[in-house]
Amino acid sequence: MQSQPTRFSITSQMDPRPTNGSIISQDTPVSERWPGPNAYERMQYPRPQDAMSIRSVVDNAAHELMSQSDMTTSATWIPNSTPASSMPESELPPYDLLYTLVDLFFKHVNPWSPILDRKATFDTFFGNQSIEDTDRILLHAIVATTLRFSKDSRLTPELKAQFHEISRQKIMLYAFDHPNVRALQALVILAVDVLGTSNGQQGWNLLALIARNIVQLGLDVEKNSYLESAAYPSATLLQASQPKTWIESEERRRLCWMTFVLDRYATVATADAFTLDERAMDRCLPCRYDLFSRNEPVETRWRRPIAQYETFAQTEMVLNRPENLGSFSYHCEVLGILSRIHRFLHQPLDITQRSDILKWRETYRELDGELNTWLQNLPGEYGKISQLCHSDPGSRISNWIMLHAAFVTSVIRLHSSAAYPTIKSHVFTPSYHAIQRCLGAVESLREIAQDVLNTGMLALLGHPFAFSLWVSARLLLVHAATMECTIDPKISFFISTLEQMGQHWQVARDYARILTDVVQEGSSGSGRTFHAMRR
């Protein structure tokens, strides 16, 4: 009887909850839901003498995130008047604290999750008009997500927990009964909070609800008074009303793309499919933040899928106005490449068939080329952000740092499959070139993270940055396990940085704890070795 050929998926099925035993058991990083060539050479090797400072990047970035706040305290930001409609103390913190929390939201969260315009939001919450129920729900979401950043002595841990739970329940109850754009904005902001606390069922369910409502309301396609897509007519009856202004139109576009971003970080290292499939989306990329804030209609970049739901569906360029793109635009683009990498790594592969291996390598090189092209097309100085030095940064640069962390994650995700295959054959052997790419990407992120620490920017970065740190640290464990060598001492830096991020994002603390346990067990001599863990 002829034996069946050996088939395996580059990324194997696993329990989504990381354990000490599973953390280095495959070729690509894993989290609870878990987590050419010349283009990124500059991200792999020691920085040149003309390395840029964060200050120089900030000074050259006047067009990006012009209105984002980097205030450390809000005492001088408290307005003289009180809102026309007072807010019950049992539901929300006092008015001055609310103002502080909204200010903190635009400092710590909105720069990398830019779905709201600062001025329009403050006018809505703290203007002379009374606040409507839909806007109050959005305020609840901001409170729930931003309480972690408040140092006000009045907000004891018990009160924070109380306000958080009240706001969470208010949002969920309202969203179930009122499927509208404002409720979706509140859900997306709440998802930032939930996914920053743990990678578990609650976050996945929340993303599923958001993605379904995005499609139901027709927010996954261009359909407004400025741009319109006729490619994918909706069959639903829950169509959102026409946006009244460019800001409203762009807010909806950003709402869809931010759901896409959160879904990628929550899904990318699982065996699951994405909740929001970009192959069915027909959306322009979001524009620069300053254009958004100025209510200035512009065109950006619009790639339309030629065929839906194919594994690597080709796209056609409908619009291309790169001068109107910002950091969030490029973040969405690189996560689109990561989406294709994710699908590629989950395709079954017969490692005994040379023809299958050749086809696999061809796709692998194509995806590598996409990453190269993306990096080369970044605006001038931002392509060298891995060379940041110490200076006086503001929140305007934090989103560009997170953008490059996403690039590092994509590089590791792709190349670790060739560098550290879980199953080998005479035609599918580990690639030394891929190993160097992975280690170079890890070093690049370490340099960026060191600059972030030296300039006091860590609190400005969101939990996706913690995810990238976790991916890089786990790569060092996989390398030690595969090569049967000692663990790189750099892993201590990644663990320490994750512990510091854990002050605001619980998921970072969990990553640090798991890594610490694995390093201790593998280094103790009495437990399993790293190589034994991977087997």
Predicted regions and their residues:
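Solvent-exposed, amphipathic alpha-helical segments
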Residues: 330-333, 337-351, 476-479
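Amphipathic alpha-helical packing segments from all-alpha helical-bundle domains
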Residues: 436-442
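Intrinsic, low-complexity transcriptional activation domains
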Residues: 1-110, 209, 238, 310, ...
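Conserved small-residue packing positions in alpha-helical repeats and bundles
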Residues: 191, 264, 403, 410-412, ...
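Eukaryotic multi-pass alpha-helical transmembrane domains
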Residues: 438, 449, 469-473
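Acidic, Ser/Thr-rich, low-complexity intrinsically disordered regions in fungal proteins
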Residues: 84-87, 92, 99-325, 343-358, ...
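Alpha-helical scaffold segments that form or flank carboxylate-/histidine-based iron centers
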Residues: 394-404
